[in-house]
């Protein structure tokens, strides 16, 4: 399903197009950018995530439309592949999850995250924030799981720092999972995010969440 690094193709796949010449996936990309506005400034309070969720829910996944962006690397847990930057207001990514692998527990750098499953399924573990007083005093504050959810193909989920922390994993030991993520504003790419230890609650900041590819080209 995904393009493994060093894999080559001999021809572009044939995909259905609408009357304007764009397939449904690329029309979704344009529509998401339009919702975020052409030029005005943006912070996370200016966006209604329900509008983004509605657009993503309306798209039925077709791998021929997005496969060119789904670059995989078997040496890492998952890859983050940039599809679009939404007039500078967001990052739209396709993440390719290797079988049985997961993300660290992380925050979202004060941004909205809307996620759609394009292929396979993903499991979300959601956590409460650790008690900062305990962390500041050098005490362990194990993270508490508040919710576990299995997300299947074409399902959409929303996450933000107001809802806590989370970890995403691919529960299938044999197959890739592939998901579409929209982050707005694109804070993690610009400023980094924080990763958390489940047993202690302690965090460390990573300066930048890097991309594996940009619009189908490996970086």
Swiss-Prot record:
Keyword terms of this UniProt record: Dioxygenase, Iron, Metal-binding, Oxidoreductase, Thioether bond, Virulence
Modification after translation (UniProt): The thioether cross-link between Cys-113 and Tyr-183 plays a structural role through stabilizing the Fe(2+) ion, and prevents the production of highly damaging free hydroxyl radicals by holding the oxygen radical via hydroxyl hydrogen.
Residues that coordinate or bind Fe cation: 106, 108, 166
Cofactor binding annotation: Binds 1 Fe cation per subunit.
A biological-process GO annotation: L-cysteine catabolic process
Keyword Metal-binding found: yes
Disruption of the gene: reported phenotype: Leads to hypersensitivity to L-cysteine. Abolishes the ability to grow on human hair and nails as substrates.
Pfam families the record matches: CDO_I
EC number: 1.13.11.20
CDD domains linked to this entry: cupin_CDO
InterPro entries: CDO_1, RmlC-like_jellyroll, RmlC_Cupin_sf
Main function: Cysteine dioxygenase involved in sulfite formation from cysteine. Required for keratin degradation and plays an important role in filamentous growth and virulence.
Family: Belongs to the cysteine dioxygenase family.
UniProt protein name: Cysteine dioxygenase
Phylogenetic placement of the source organism: Eukaryota, Fungi, Dikarya, Ascomycota, Pezizomycotina
């Amino acid at each position: 399903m995904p393009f493994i690094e060093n894999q080559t193709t001999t021809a572009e796949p044939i995909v259905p197009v609408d009357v304007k010449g764009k397939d449904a996936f690329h029309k979704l990309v344009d529509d998401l950018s339009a919702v975020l506005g052409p030029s005005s400034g943006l912070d996370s309070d200016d966006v209604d995530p329900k509008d983004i969720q509605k657009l993503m829910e309306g798209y039925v996944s077709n791998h021929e439309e997005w496969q060119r962006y789904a670059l995989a690397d078997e040496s890492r847990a998952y890859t983050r592949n940039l599809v679009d930057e939404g007039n500078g207001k967001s990052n739209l990514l396709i993440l390719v999850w290797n079988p049985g692998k997961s993300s660290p527990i992380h925050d979202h750098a004060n941004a909205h995250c809307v996620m759609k499953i394009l292929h396979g399924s993903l499991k979300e573990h959601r956590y409460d924030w650790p008690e900062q007083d305990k962390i500041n005093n050098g005490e362990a504050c194990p993270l508490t799981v508040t919710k576990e959810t299995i997300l299947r193909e074409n399902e959409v989920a929303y996450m933000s720092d107001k809802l806590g922390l989370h970890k995403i994993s691919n529960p299938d030991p044999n197959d890739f999972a592939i998901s579409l993520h929209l982050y707005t504003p694109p804070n993690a790419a610009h400023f980094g995010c924080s990763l958390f230890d489940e047993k202690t609650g302690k965090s460390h900041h990573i300066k930048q969440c890097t991309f594996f590819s940009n619009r189908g080209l490996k970086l």
